[in-house]
Amino acid sequence: MGKLTFAERAWLEYLHWQAKDLKTLKRINMLLKDIDRNGNDGIGKPEKLRHRDGWSRRIDDVNRLVYQLRDDGSVEVLQCKGHYDD
């Protein structure tokens, strides 16, 4: 996997899933692996954000993985809980 970083908020959300819901954590990890392999194509219905820089993918009906894919191939996770800044 290329370089992966988490914004502070996203890391706290990731730790929440690690403690509370392993099924959701597994889905997040699967999405991150797919982003590494396929960029902005693949599973989770990748969608370019309209009002800010970045992309989102569906974790489930309620939660979204929001991230930025950098030119150097690195990924920064901005959010992994809620539905866009909820």
Predicted regions and their residues:
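A short, surface-exposed loop/turn module that caps and links secondary-structure elements
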Residues: 33-59
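Enriched for short, Lys/Arg-rich terminal
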Residues: 1-4, 9-25, 58-64, 68-86
